[in-house]
Amino acid sequence: MPYIEPVRTAEVWDPELRELIERCERLGVPDSLFPRILARVPAYAKALLRAMLLSHTEGNVDHKLKEIIRIQLARRAGDPYFAGLRSAKAMADGLDEAAIAAGCDDYERSPRFSEAEKWALRYADRMYLDPASVDAAFYAGMKHHYSEAQIMELGAFIALHYGMQVFMRTLGNGAPT
């Protein structure tokens, strides 16, 4: 059980927050646990959940790729909760555990990923392992595969989800319930 007790679903009175929690449950990422912990501060919960859902399910970068990145980051953050969750949408669209494993391992040598996908995975790696290497030359290389808008979409997604994963890890929860 996490160090901060989640609010019971029946105690969530704000209709927008209830709908966001239901959307999270349908997607599977996050399930209802993390949103119900955040629900102790409803305004913050709504803002964070809207941002998490928007960054993960919308935009012009493939959702399956974002899901691989999200899991890669959760593993890097040492968070078994987020690392164990799977997007129902990504799985329905054909993402499988073999692709996730390849994206979290030696994706650079994997024939499974295009050069563009490798750049996105590399971006996530470098933002947390070697941020100094994400420089003008790195962005110039990314621009061969992604528009500036897509780069911003990926960067914001990476920063937000990694931060939430580190936060959840500090709350002391293990694998998903």
Language model segments and positions:
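Conserved alpha-helical segments that form or flank metal/cofactor-binding pockets of metalloenzymes
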Residues: 66, 70-100
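Helix N-cap / loop-to-helix initiation motif
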Residues: 61-62, 96-97, 147-148
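C-terminal end-helix/capping segment
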Residues: 94-96, 169-177
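Acidic/His metal-coordination segments adjacent to aromatic residues that form catalytic metal sites
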Residues: 103-113
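Alpha-helical transition-metal enzyme core signature, strongest for iron centers
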Residues: 41-45, 72-83, 120, 124-131, ...
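Mobile cap/lid helix-loop segments that border enzyme active or cofactor-binding sites
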Residues: 1-63, 87, 91
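Alpha-helical scaffold segments that form or flank carboxylate-/histidine-based iron centers
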Residues: 33-37, 63-78, 108, 152-155
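Acidic/histidine-rich alpha-helical segments that form the ligand environment
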Residues: 112-156
